[in-house]
Amino acid sequence: MSKVAIVGDFHLGVAPNNSLKFETLFESQQRFFTECLIPVLKARKIDTIIFTGDLYDQRRRIDSKIAQYVEGLFQNELKDFKCIVLQGNHDTYYKDDLTVTSLSNIWSKPNVTAITKITPMELFGVKFLFVPWLTSSMSEKFIENVDKVAGRFQYVVGHFETMGFPFEAGSICTNGMNPEILYNNFKNTISGHFHTQSFKEVNGNSIHYVGTPFQLT
């Protein structure tokens, strides 16, 4: 029986302007993969990993050491896993256009599926809808057409900015998408983007922000 792991924003390459912090966090992130995540996935016989966006931290300038590490990570340590990687806003060069993305250095890997547009997919008999970071025009189209796909998917996995959810401890998002759009059309919504884990349920339909897997500050 196949199993899926869902992991939140990694922000590899965070704090580029502080060399000590950059190196400390990068070493910690590497240890998380080699000493925690990968051993746990193998022990639990998980074969598919869904990354909910923001694999990288810097939108416009990727440190060459980070780029080389990420390429090697998916080519070597993660080669036995099917990896579904959503494009987050930090993986996107332009603020409101997804065409240029830092994920381009891994999407040719045979084990990687990069989600750069809204993509339906069936995994192990379960219907998923994958939603990358939504530009303003994409968000408008998503909202206009969401009722056409309502009830068709067991899980929606995205990189949503949703009002009323904490993006950090003690800070609530006051902008973005009205959560009713997700509650009214999907049974289970799972999202990256916000760094604090949270869960809310309305009339049996839920939104779950998975949060970051480690401290980023």
Which residues are covered by each model-predicted region?
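Short acidic-hydrophobic surface loop/beta-edge motif
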Residues: 117-125, 200-202
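Active-site glycine-centered loops adjacent to acidic/histidine catalytic or metal-binding residues
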Residues: 9, 53-54, 88-89, 159, ...
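Active-site-proximal beta-strand elements of phosphoester/diester hydrolases
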Residues: 3-14, 125-134, 155-159, 207-211
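Short, well-ordered alpha-helix to beta-strand connector turns
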Residues: 46, 125, 151-153, 186, ...
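Core catalytic region of metal-dependent phosphoesterases/phosphodiesterases
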Residues: 2-3, 10, 14-120, 182-186
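Hydrophobic/aromatic residues located in beta-strands of well-ordered beta-sheets
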Residues: 49, 83-85, 128, 154, ...
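Binuclear metal-dependent hydrolase catalytic cores centered on His/Asp/Glu-rich metal-binding motifs
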Residues: 123-181
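Conserved beta-sheet core of the metallophosphoesterase superfamily
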Residues: 163, 168-217
